[in-house]
From Swiss-Prot:
LRR repeats (start-end): 78-97, 102-123, 132-154, 156-177, 182-204, 205-227, 228-248
Residue numbers spanned by region Disordered: 262-301
GO MF terms, alphabetically ordered: phenylalanine-tRNA ligase activity; RNA binding
UniProt cross-references to SUPFAM superfamilies, sorted A to Z: L domain-like
Keyword rRNA-binding found: no
Protein name in the entry: Leucine-rich repeat-containing protein 47
PROSITE patterns in the cross-refs: LRR
Keywords, sorted A to Z: Coiled coil, Leucine-rich repeat, Phosphoprotein, Repeat
PTM sites of type Phosphoserine: S314, S430, S519
Taxonomic superkingdom: Eukaryota
Pfam families membership: LRR_1, LRR_4, LRR_8
Organism ancestry: Eukaryota, Metazoa, Chordata, Craniata, Vertebrata
Length: 581
């Protein structure tokens, strides 16, 4: 045994020195490293994982290193940087690499990786395997796909380098709203990417995007909605829009984004393209004249802007308040509320479009209502102050949308029976994703509910709203709520997205009614601010912005828990949205 220990000491003197001097950094490289790793079975020596003080570990240029070896995560819990570049890691990567709770930099470039651990990204997804990871370099490998839960595994990722792999698509989860809120640099040049999802607009912090030398044929116009994007590279892609292809080869990022924002993209006929080019030249001349005459450059884009006005609690003589009882903490602790005034749901299919956008948010950002739930109410029917509480299933009664009054326990059981019947009819092994939220309340002694000042339950999350506050075509002012058992920030992110969609719908509705308004034939001017004290002047395009009114959530003693929108909310919206505070 002593002889074996002596042999290890002689083979790995760097480890003995690091242990003796309590080093925080260790670099293993050089000509003798390959033979020693080969003798250790293509893995790092187990003794390396008995140095818990290490913050930085680099093993590079070793053609015999095929796997880090078991014990890395358990033995090096304080590791901040792990650099394993230009080795022979692959074709897979063992799950033992995570979790590493303190890791900030992971460099696996220049290896032979074909896959990452299936189902768990680079570590367990719940909780995140790499919760502090900021930089991930996977360039120069042979990856054909990324794990779907990569964003869950590394939610604080800021830089992702995928250059020089064999990827043909990004996983949709990577661009899910709020999935990677800090990602500022994405490089995936020299791959086989065929399509870029419009959902890339959800990367609110993206500054640099390099997708050169792929197989893209179209660049989504939504890319222009990334508010911080400063540098893009699409060279080496054969785009359908030849003018755009020429632009990406020589124009600045700003010009390309302006072209996308104006609607220029692949797939148009030659005649339409020439007409568009002529129109673009005309607009450029007009902008130049505006600049030379001292007029604002922003005037051209004013008609495309969305306006939101935040009304603070102090400006409202009768603010709505939500009180929270302590019992709800064990069931569904997080709630955010807001009031939106000035919606017009009467024209055409505006109401249906509003409800469809809410359903889409439930499917995407709310993860089929399992992460969070949205409820929208006709403010005229809401009697404040409101109470967010938890009640026994036998005592909680509600008049659900489209149904008769029922106890919560009976309603949930009925919905579960309906879901099971649907499963049998469609011959599925499990209930559809649409109904999975029904099981969130299994085993709960109390159910969450929102109660108005008259004692009526107006919301039973995540199950249903009440018929009492149902949204109708005549609804102008709405009370919005988002609840979650996951996090308060998720509630805020979803509320941001909901209000943005409402602003877009309001703008679209106003544009469709513009001719009637100009001709004076608009019959109903009742959709506005119901409170005469809450007035707002029109914007440059003659349209009034939506008013987003703050709602305070307090405990039973009146101490503030959260207010929305605060000064840190509604700040990651696209550049065409202006928030007046």
């Amino acid at each position: 045994m002593a002889a074996a220990a002596m042999a290890v000491s002689e083979a790995w003197p760097e480890l003995e020195l690091a242990e003796r001097e309590r080093r925080r950094e260790l670099l293993l490289t050089g000509p003798g490293l390959e033979e020693r790793v080969k003798a250790a079975g293509g893995r790092l020596p187990p003794r390396l994982f008995t140095l818990p003080l290490l913050h930085y570990l680099e093993v590079s240029g070793c053609g015999s290193l095929r796997a880090p070896g078991p014990g890395l995560a358990q033995g090096l819990p304080q590791l901040h940087s792990l650099v394993l570049r230009r080795n022979a890691l692959g074709p897979g990567l063992s799950p033992e690499l995570g979790p590493l709770p303190a890791l900030r930099v992971l460099d696996l470039s220049g290896n032979a990786l074909e896959t990452l651990p299936p189902g768990e990204g680079l570590g367990p997804a719940e909780p995140p395997g790499l919760p502090q990871l900021q930089s991930l370099n996977l360039s120069g490998n042979r990856l054909r796909e990324l794990p779907a839960d990569l964003a869950r595994c590394a939610p604080r990722l800021q830089s992702l380098n995928l250059t020089g792999n064999r990827l043909d698509a990004f996983p949709p989860e990577l661009f899910r709203p709020g999935a990677l809120p800090l990602l500022s640099e994405l490089a995936a040049a020299d791959n086989c990417l065929r399509e870029l999802s419009p959902d890339i607009a959800h990367l609110a912090s993206l500054k640099t995007l390099d997708l050169s030398n792929n197989q893209l044929t179209e660049i989504p116009a939504e890319l222009a909605d990334c508010p911080k994007l400063k540098e893009i590279n699409f060279r080496g892609n054969r785009l359908r829009d030849k003018r755009l292809e020429k632009m990406v080869g020589g124009c600045q990022t700003k010009s390309i984004l302006e072209y996308l924002r104006a609607g220029g993209r692949g797939g148009r006929s030659k005649g339409r393209q020439e007409a568009s080019e002529k129109e673009d030249r005309k607009k450029r001349r007009e902008r130049k004249q505006h600049r030379e005459s001292g007029e604002g450059e922003e005037e051209v884009a004013d008609s495309a802007r969305l306006m939101l006005k935040v009304l603070h609690v102090s400006e409202n003589p009768t603010p709505l308040t939500v009180r929270v009882s302590p019992e709800v903490k064990d069931v569904r602790p997080y709630i955010v509320g807001a009031i939106v005034r000035g919606m017009d749901l009467q024209p055409g299919n505006a109401l249906r479009r509003f409800l469809n956008s809410q359903t889409k948010l439930h499917d995407d950002l709310c993860e089929k209502r399992t992460a969070a739930t949205i409820a929208t109410h006709d403010l005229q029917a809401v009697r404040g102050p409101l109470l967010y509480a938890a009640r026994p299933p036998e005592d909680l009664k509600i008049v659900p949308l489209g149904r008769k009054e029922a106890k919560a326990k009976e309603l949930v059981r009925q919905l579960q029976l309906e879901a099971e019947e649907q499963r049998k009819q469609k011959k599925r092994q499990s209930v559809s994703g649409l109904h999975r939220y029904l099981h969130l309340l299994d085993g709960k002694e109390n159910y969450p509910c929102l109660v108005d000042a008259e004692g009526d339950v107006i919301s039973f999350p995540p199950i249903t709203n009440s018929e009492k506050t149902k949204i109708k075509k005549t609804t102008c002012n709405l009370f919005l709520e988002v609840t979650s058992a996951t996090s308060l920030q998720l509630c805020k992110d979803i509320m941001d997205s909901l209000i943005l969609r409402m602003a877009e719908l309001s703008k679209s509705t106003s544009e469709n009614k513009e001719e009637d308004m100009l001709s004076g034939t608009e019959a109903d001017a009742g959709c506005g601010l119901s409170d005469p004290n809450l007035t707002l002047s029109s914007g440059k395009d003659g349209q009034c912005p939506l008013v987003v009114e703050q709602v305070r959530v307090v405990d039973l003693e009146g101490s503030l828990k959260v207010v929305y929108p605060s000064k840190t909310d509604l700040i990651t919206l696209p550049p065409h949205v202006t928030v007046v505070r």
